[in-house]
Amino acid sequence: MKRAIIIGASSGIGFEVARLLLDDGWKVGVAARRVDLLQTIGNVSEAEQIDVTDPNAAEHLRSMISQLGGMDLLIYTAGIGKQNRELTEGIEVQTTETNGVGFVRMIGEAYRYFAEKGEGHIVAVTSIAGTKGLGPAPAYSATKAMQNVYLQALEQQAHARGLDIHFTDIRPGFVDTALLNGDFHYPMLMQPEMVARKIMQAIKRKQHICVIDWRYHLLTMLWRRIPRFIWRRMKL
């Protein structure tokens, strides 16, 4: 039986992916800050409270891997994101610590484990927000760009070392989860159940980059072609 661990599985995308993996016959371990919500997923083998900003979080992941009897797949869906047009320091720092430091801590630990094992698959839910610097959410878009590049760097390193480690960078747009501010109307809003199904397809195909929904794929292609002198004048 294949074994998967999901970091950030208490709600939204991670929650739905956990349910699909269970239906597909995987042995699943789940982790999040809100451990009480993990109990509602279903017949998971391990449920652990992990805060990715905790310096000891990587040790907790190692312990979880041991309790599960090993790991073949790591899915990382943890993260925060807020609009911060006033550039409030606390929001920027918290976002960077969670999406930056926390991401490196947990993805790095999974990579080291798979390097010892010789094979594995790391899947991370990042965002299309990493495509360009977004003025309404500076730290969020910056950390998402960092996540994209970090996965690419690890993929190159793994290949250079002859390691059979696969990487899948999942880049959704707006998803109807608690991460979004309910007072704002988000265009092209997607449901987490649909996103989870797309993630499962990407996992089975060992897809390198998966932009969820063709509309967001076209949008990011357009963004990349906008010159900087025009981009800085755009109101988002």
Q: How should these model regions be labeled?
A:
Residues 10, 18:
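N-terminal Rossmann NAD(P)H-binding glycine-rich loop of SDR-like oxidoreductase domains
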Residues 42-56:
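Rossmann-fold cofactor-recognition segment
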Residues 77-83:
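Conserved NAD(P)H cofactor-binding loop of Rossmann-fold oxidoreductase domains
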Residues 84-97:
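Short alpha-helical oligomerization interface
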Residues 107, 143:
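Active-site helix of classical SDR
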Residues 127:
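Residue(s) in the substrate-gating loop at a strand-loop-helix junction
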Residues 169, 184-219:
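C-terminal helical subdomain
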